[in-house]
Swiss-Prot record:
The keyword Phosphoprotein does not apply. Involved in oxygen transport from the lung to the various peripheral tissues. Belongs to the globin family. This is Hemoglobin subunit beta-1. Keywords: Heme, Iron, Metal-binding, Oxygen transport, Transport. It comes from Xenopus tropicalis. The gene is hbb1. Residues 3-147 form the Globin domain. Coiled coil: none annotated. Pfam families: Globin. Heterotetramer of two alpha chains and two beta chains. GO terms for cellular component: hemoglobin complex. It comes from the Eukaryota. Heme b binds at residues 64, 93. Red blood cells.
Amino acid sequence: MVNLTAKERQLITGTWSKICAKTLGKQALGSMLYTYPWTQRYFSSFGNLSSIEAIFHNAAVATHGEKVLTSIGEAIKHMDDIKGYYAQLSKYHSETLHVDPYNFKRFCSCTIISMAQTLQEDFTPELQAAFEKLFAAIADALGKGYH
């Protein structure tokens, strides 16, 4: 369970309803793949990821980014049991994909930055703090399969 106040929960749900998973997901995943190029090894089926242009024009990056952000949107509906919500996905990432669990934190950081770029002046320090808490819980839940 993530320890969020009622105000933080309200900020998160209210803001998330304004988020376009397709746009933000592409931006966040693309940023991670470009900023941390070693993470590309988990996405070899995506084809050309050799440059920033290739990454941000890659349909598979956009599709997977949207999928991840849609999953986060669903997790927001389960804030009282994020670990339970992500239990199977955590197991899949650890046992099948062998993803470095720190990459979940990297992706969440890229998502925060992408949200700030998208929301601009609406991305207040209070909102950032709420999402930082939520994303820390999500990264922890996804890394749970490694323990």
